Every structure is written in C-alpha cells, then in structure tokens.
C-alpha cells in the first residue's frame, strides 16, 4: 500500500471513530490478558502484557518516551513491543515485553487505539498498574520542585515500588501522617496534603520503614507562588507578509495576576545574528497586569522569513505563541480555483460560496462580476457569498484583481450551476377529475428541472381507498387534499393497464426559452376509474402529480335532461332531470329564476352566480329518484304534469362539490309552445280524373300539435291499403290506377285539443276500364322481351370478362401449395378447416371502411371483440367477396383460407386470426391489420427523409439483433424447414394473435429511413419466404406491393388474392386471358408457366431492386413487349440501384440467374442478409464501394466489376490465389462478395464475358403498338395478347426453356429516383401516420367515423388501398 493511501486510510478511520464517539455510539474497548487493576512482580522478573482490539493498537507506559528517545542498547533489549495474532472478534493484537524489570518500571501501562485521539478508559483504552517490588529501593521518584499555589490541596508525588507501605511526610519542621481525612496516601499517586500545611515548608520528603531499615525519598523543593498567567497574544495574530526592506514589528502581550513578574524570550530565524531588538513594557491595570515585549526589525530581508515564537514564563506557568513572517522580493498576485472551475448549488439554498485560492501582496483591489456585469455590495476577494440561491443565480462569475502601483492584473472565472428540483407545471392549474366513459383522454405532465429529468415514470392503482395524510385549514376546518400514501402503485404498461393505453410518449421541447420534458399518456378508452400519477426525478429532487381519473357516464359529472327533449306543447307532461355523479357532487336542488329580481332598480342585469342563486330564484319541490343497483349517480327530477305558458322560464339545478364545498349550477330554459286550433291553409277542390290514372289530394294544416288527420269517402273512414297511400302525417292522399268505384265525396278532418276543421271535395271518374286491356298486354310483352335481351347481353359480357372457375382459383391466389405436392384443382378439397379452432362469431365483428377492392373481392377494416381470447377490441382486416359472388369465387376464397391455415403462423407473414364460414352470412377471412400499408408506398413516401447512416436507437438495434439471433437459434434447434420458425419476437407466447393494446416503440412516419432499415426489410422478407418454402408453398407474386409494414419495423408477406383489381393495376400485364406481373416473373414462368420456389427467388431479386431504389418501378423506361421478354430470356438484366451495396448487388445477380437451379435458396439468403444486418457490414461495403467507384470509369460501374469478379473466379484460381482475393478475407461476413455454395463460383470463365448487357446499353428498336384499354403498364407501353401468342409459338418451336451458359451476359437496368433533399421531413407524416397516396393503387383511405369501428392503436389508416 502506498504511504499516502495508508495515511488517508488512517485519517478516515480516525475521523470516523471520533465521529462515532461524538455521536454517542458504543465502541468495543481493547482487552488485556491481565485482568487485575494492579499487578505485582519482583525486580528482575520479566513482564509480558498482550492487548487485543478491533482497530490498530499502540502501547504507552512510564518511561516509554525515554526509551524511544535514548535508543539505548539496554532499553532495546529489555523493552519490546511486537504484533501478535488476533482473534476473529478482535483481529488486532500488540504484546509488550519487558525483561529484567526494576523498580523504575513501576507505573501504569496503557493500551489504546492508535488512530483515536481520545483515550477513554474502558472505551478506547485499557490499562493496568504494575508494581515492580524492590525492597532496597521502595521510592522511585526523582528530585523536583513543588509549586504551592492557592488550591485547597495538592499531591506530593512520592511514588513507591512496593504497595501497602506505611508512609509519612516530613519537612524541616513537621511530620505528617495519613489520617484518612485531610492527609491521604495513594500507592499510585503519593500523599495528598492541604496547602495550608505546606506554606512554611522549605522541602518535603517521604519516609518509610521496611524491616529494620528506614528509607527516604528524593526531596521536593517547595516554592510558594500566587502569580497566575491568564492569557498571551501575539500581534498580528495571522501570518505577516512584507516586502524586502520594510519594517517588521511584533507585539507579544501577557495578561497576568496583579503584581506578577514574567520573563519573555523570543525565538526567530535571525536570532543568532541579533537582527531584532525587543523592548519590554508593563501596564498595571486595576484587576491585572499587562506585560508586553515588542520585537522590531527595521529592514527585513529574505533571511528574516520564518516562524517567530514568543515565550512567557513566571516560574509556574509557561505560555507560548507563534506567528509566521513571509518576506516577498516584489509585489505579486496569484489566484487559483479552490474547488474547481464549476460549482454547483441547489435552488432554495440559503447561501452558496464561490471560493478562490488567492495569494497577493500588497493586498490588491478587486471586483466581482456576473456575466460581465459588476456585482454590487461589499464582498470578499477570497470568496463571493450569494444568499437565497435561485435559478437566476446561475452564471459565470469573474473575480478581477489589480495592483495599479505595480501594474499587475489577474482574472479568474467560476461557473455556478444551479440545480433545480423538478417541478410538474400541471399541478399549478386545476385539472378535471371526471372523465366521460368510452372517451379518449390524454394525461399530460410537463416538468422542468436542472439537470433535465431523464424520464417520466407513470404509475396507476385501482380506485380503492388508501391512507391519506391530510392537513386541516385553521379557518375553514376542512381537510385539504393530501397525497395518498398508497403502496400498491403499479407501473403503467400496455399489458395489464386497467384502461387500454394507446400511447405513452415523452419528449423535450423548448417553452419560454427553457427545455421542458413533456410526457403524454393517451388512454384509448376510458372504462374504469383509477388513480394515475407521474413521477419525475433528477439528482437534487423529485416531484409527482396525482390524477384522480374518475370515469362517469354523465358528461362533466353534472347535467340536465328534459323529457320531451324538444320544446313541449301546452298541456304536455314535462320532466326535468338533474343528474350528478355521487363521487363529486351532493345536495342537489332545483330553483326557478325570478325574472323580476334579475335586474336592479335602474334595470341593469345583475351578475348571476351559483353562490347567490338563492337570492334570485325560488326553490322547487323535486323528487330524488331511487338509484339503480350499482349506479354511481343521483337524479333529482322536477315533474310538471301539464305544462302551461306561465311555466316557461329558466330552471336552475344546483349541486355542491364534496371536496371543495363550492356550488355549481346548470341552467335550462323551458320554452312552452302554446296550443292553437288547427287551420287549413288550402281547401280541397272537386276533381275530374280518368280511369287508370293517379289521384292525389292534399289537406295542408297549420297550427301546433296536430294529433290526428282522418280521411273519409262517402262518410266512411278511409284507411291505407293496396293502391291507397296516406303520407305526410296523413296530409296527402294518393290513389294509384283510379277505378270507377273511386268516384265520390272525400272529406279531410283535422282535430286537436283546441278543436277540429274539415274540408271536402267531389271526385268524378270518366272513361272505361276495358279500353286499357290491350295496352296492358302490349306493355307487359315489351317489358318481358327487353328483360330477356338484357339478361342475355349480361351473360355474354360476364363470360367474356370473367376467367374460368379453375382460373379464378389458381389465377387470383398468389400463394399456393407446390403443385408437385398437391395438384391445384385438388388443394381446396385436400386441405381441412377446423371450425372449433378458427370460427369467429359474426356478431363480435364490426365492419368499418373498405381498405381495398378488386374485381371479385374486397378487404375491409374491422373491429374484432375478443379475438385474442380476451375482452379487448382489436383492429383486424377482413377479406370477403363482393355481392353476387359465384360459387367458384366462394371456393377460391375458401381455398385461400385453407392455405393460410396450412401455412401456419410466422412473424413475417400476414397471419390468419379467424374466419366466418357459417351460412348465415358472407364468407369472411380475418387476418392481421398492418397500419403502415404496403412497402412500395411506404418507401416512396419516405424518400424525403432517407438518411443512410442515421443512428438507430438502442431499442431498434436490440430488435434487429433479436431478429437475426432468433432466426439462427430456431434454425439450429429445429432446422430451417420446421414450423417453429414462427418467432416469438414481439408476438407473446407463440401466438400470432397480438396482445391487446401493444405499445408501439415509435412512429415510423416520424423516424428517418436508413440503409439499415432496407437491409432489415430484405432480411425479414427472405425469412418469411424461407418459411413459406418450408411449408411447400409458392407465392407467385412476390413484390413490394404485396409486403405490408407493421409496428416495430416488422414486414409481413401477404396475398391479396381476389381483393386486388388486376384489371386496373398497371403492374399486371395481360397475357392471353390472364393478367400477369411480368416485371417480377422469372423467364421459365413467362414462357413455360412454371412456378417454383426458384421462380420466387427471381421475384425476390426484383423486390430487392424495389427496396434499394426506394419504391421505384422495375425496368424504368423499358417497353414491356416481345423484345423485352426475349432479351430477358437471353440474359439481359436490370442495372442495380445506386443505393445497393456490393453484397446486395451480388444477391440480386444470383437471384436472376438464368438457370433456376443456380439461384440461391431462401435459407442462404436469410443467412447472408442476417450477417449483414447483425454485423453492420453494409457500412464497410459502402466505403469500399465509394473507393471502387473513384477508381473506375463511369462506363464500368462498381456493380459490373464486382459482379464479374465474383462470377468468374475458378476453383483453381480460388485455391491458388492468396486469401485476400477471397472476398477481402471477409467471406464469412459476405461483405464484398456473396458466398453461395455451388452457386457463384463454378466452371471456367467464358471467353469474352468481361461485361454484362444492360437494357440501356443495347438500343431499343422503336416499335409502335396499338394499346388496348385493358393493356396498361406503368411505363405507358403495353404488350398485346397477339404478341404473347407469337412469343409462345416461337418458344414452342425453339423447345422448352433452358438456362443460359454460366458465362452468359446478364444485364442490370439502372433506375433510381432523385434522392436530393431526403432530410426534409414529409408533411404527410406529421399527423401521426396519416398517409395520402396517389391514384396508382387506389383512392385515399378515409378514417373510420366515431362509432363505426373500435379505436385502434394510433387511430391510423391501414395505409394500403389494395389490402
């Protein structure tokens, strides 16, 4: 251990123990092996005493100091202190050994704790008294002088080596014997004698007799004194500083008893040279005498610096005082920080000091400044004292020092940081404690503190009583609100929250120049009353806000309802109900305002307040209704049986707040409509009508409250029947196809409580009914013929537009089982459907807006109650058929359902949640809802915020690592084809059904898109396709439009099936009677209609191109025609996007291999992309790619060079080449090449294959085609049906599709949008995920209206109109 460290440890131990003693704490004392209070041995014997304790020990005894100072050889041999072995309870041990003891070794032997200054017997020390008997030397004291003063008694220290002797005290004139009262003897201390008996003594000796021999002690000379020194002072008291050549004057003064004598002596550096002179002075006062000695040196030098000591002695007492004299050669100023440049304080402190270490002579002038402004007041240059510290006290303080005479100036600055305990601002304003049931509520805590609180913690507890410490106001004697002292607070989470949590966000924003932390807890659906609190911390304090979240069905906890709700009519029964929540209000009362008292004598309106409503209103009798069981509100009803016009006026319901005792009131104005007698605005007139025509008669009525209008014909009541219609509250009579018997007298009678009014008219009918028989026959015949031709045309049109039934099943479903496993036409019958596992009740499914629709089906957003085996409401997507669907379309959707069941659950596949297949309604397939829509639209929207190397949060990186590590762990444990690849990442206990109200980590619309995100999306798609391949399923339409993006950057592969309108989607090109996504199809699929997992790998390469071009359409500017298909077959490929790294480019190239068997498997792609994502290799690749670009010409880009290099390394070259040639020694990480076993490194390099063909390098032959309406592509070019027929016929002539030679050229088409300005945040993402899409994929989705759907997490759009 270093000496400094040991010293520090000792000081720490000493201070700690002293502190413990000062505070009264007990301490275990050391113990001796000799337990007797006194111990007797004979001279010549050896003495050994061991001491043990809990702390380091030390010994002291009479004569020990002499041994240490003399260092004689004898003493070293006879007196030894050594360490010994301690015990577990007392680990420290010291043993004292004395050999050949003699009488002078008699005395007390103390063992004490070494680093504790206080030596307290029985606490910090232990001792024993040892007598070393020497019968020839019973007395062991030395000659000494005894000063006899005015004390009552004194000890004559006649020390003995033999205890129990009879001792007498002898002087020149008397002998004193111990009498046990005034004269006492102690074997350890000597003889105690009254001072009066010693006034005349000149000397004293102790005498004893042992055997026949008398012994006398050494004599004590007696000196009688009454001179007492009181105090001594040396001026100046502190150290004295001088310059060379200045005069030094020191004054040493002693205060002594009156008429005393004192001798002064000085000790100083120049004493031998007699540099100083001192002069004594004496001043007699009334009660004492002042004696001084003044030392003077007229011209000091460097030799005079040092300590100056003054000693005063009167023969009895001796006082010493010293000071330090410092001599400087020249003036100087030196200032340093004492505690560092930055000091901290807390707002509210009474005082803070800003100290500096200042050394200067002569004392300089000074000024303190704060932020370059002078600090007023009187201050000290050594420390600036600030009182009542506030946040405004923070700043930079500067001390300016200067000596104008010497031309010296120094400045030093200190920064004061004032820490402010956090404070929640919402506590200052009253907040509502009543919240409406099923409402969306936001609880906010805005806090400010220094340092800024790092987080805001939210807690909740059930609405149950808990102990409250409340104070009482002395004035009102009512309890104030106190913070409940509850111990059952729980952290707010999305899993076990009593009210579903939509989001919990915390951010920092600048308010009034201060950075404040804002935390918002959004409660999606207020269902249950609870207590919430937010807690904030920083290093100097904490604050919390308690929120009483009381949920009620009454708006604002207090409302008035009236029956009827509209203005009542005179004579109606009226009921006014005042409803108030029992938790908040009590003492309900009804009043009616007096109009005469609402104005003063001058007619001015008076201020109406709920506190004085009784002064302007009349109390009314009302009935308190009996509350229903479980009800938490009271209802006070005011009933008016027959309302009259004089009842019109203002009615006030008054309630009282239970806590504050404040009164609140609501006012309801009751407007009464006076009842009037009915009157006709128009009388009936006589009519003449033809037979088989229509007749209409009106009886318009004016006047309030018409209870009945009755029609009569020939004094017989006319009622509504076939051909006779009464409308508009019976004010209009209509007769269809008038007959002869309808002629007669018609009467309209209108009555209410005030009376009746009538009007009548005659109706005459002319013509005969026989004349219209032929007309009816002709009309009916014409109608039947028209309907027949219309149905015939409709059937012809449907047969032309619709594909065959088998085509519907196989053509509109993207994901199918491998035909090699199960034939397409047998897949629906082969797969089973378990009703008990997947059937979901229709009545618990609430359909919302349409997310997308196709020619035969549609996808609807819906709210499913309890689909996750709980009581929560989840937002789902429902696939269903349009109205009028055929049995074939029904079978196609059923096949899709069974395929989804067969596939099973996986994180990167849109999973099946349930289905409605029972015959009491339409067939509905319920799948997961992905709020961010398809990946293609998402990437296009995020182009503006693309930042390739933006830092990801630790949570995002944890998710990325979990994806890769989870995939590797599952593959190692169960194999890549096992169904257990469905990861547990963010999905709960292995279930695809999401837990309710999962809190989203962040809003993807607000975060920038990075290169790491693109690699992550690619990895997840590859993993999902690996799972589909393991389930013997083929997708056939793998593209970015069929990849959906969910929370936490999770992508899911979907199959829109019947819900995609391929007739309007420009990505589907007509081929014969079908429309196909040619840009994503492998050559064998285009020419041979062969769909395999290898053809899905080709589509995956095109998907990679889409991802790394940020949503661009493949083959930009290329005409999709016969020449395109032929060149694709011949090996021409797209150029890689600019954002693609070398590894990504190699993956694309390998996916586009002409030989399907040479393409990588999805398991290889998962491994490579996983390594890229986990290791961050894309960053290194980008740097190497930039270096590669700089060394190549613009004509031969990095993709071409890197691709050809990787393709054409032969096996021999690979064995002979150095390791650096293989992927830059990073083959295991796949940074600069793609290592597919047996895929890329094969065969020999074909001659002349140093470069590959791209579409833009070979000129396109301009050809004009006539575009039909249904042949649309995104490039504006079409490929007509007859062209495909030519391709197919030519292909049949050439033979079946075969792969090109490995050395064949491959072509990459360049296409990348302008990426300038990516850091601008898009405006469409500023509203929390609402996205507006172009018309390429459908119309803008609309949010669900209130009540139409269950609130979903984030309340965002589905983000894809084609779902």
Curated annotation (Swiss-Prot):
Disulfide bonds join 51-111, 158-206, 252-310, 445-534, 466-486, 578-653, 699-751. Residues 1289-1317 have a biased composition (Basic and acidic residues). It comes from the Eukaryota. Its EC number is 2.7.10.1. Residues 25-775 are extracellular. Residues 797-1363 are cytoplasmic. One of its GO terms (cellular component) is cytoplasm. Residues 1289-1330 are annotated as: Disordered. Glycans are attached at residues 33, 104, 166, 251, 299, 411, 515, 527, 582, 594, 683, 758. Keywords: Angiogenesis, ATP-binding, Cell membrane, Cytoplasm, Disulfide bond, Glycoprotein, Immunoglobulin domain, Kinase, Membrane, Nucleotide-binding, Nucleus, Phosphoprotein, Receptor, Repeat, Signal, Transferase, Transmembrane, Transmembrane helix, Tyrosine-protein kinase. Belongs to the protein kinase superfamily. Tyr protein kinase family. CSF-1/PDGF receptor subfamily. The first and second Ig-like C2-type (immunoglobulin-like) domains are sufficient for VEGFC binding. The fourth and fifth Ig-like C2-type (immunoglobulin-like) domains are sufficient for homodimerization. The fifth and seventh Ig-like C2-type (immunoglobulin-like) domains are required for autophosphorylation and further activation. Tyrosine-protein kinase that acts as a cell-surface receptor for VEGFC and VEGFD, and plays an essential role in adult lymphangiogenesis and in the development of the vascular network and the cardiovascular system during embryonic development. Promotes proliferation, survival and migration of endothelial cells, and regulates angiogenic sprouting. Signaling by activated FLT4 leads to enhanced production of VEGFC, and to a lesser degree VEGFA, thereby creating a positive feedback loop that enhances FLT4 signaling. Modulates KDR signaling by forming heterodimers. This is Vascular endothelial growth factor receptor 3.
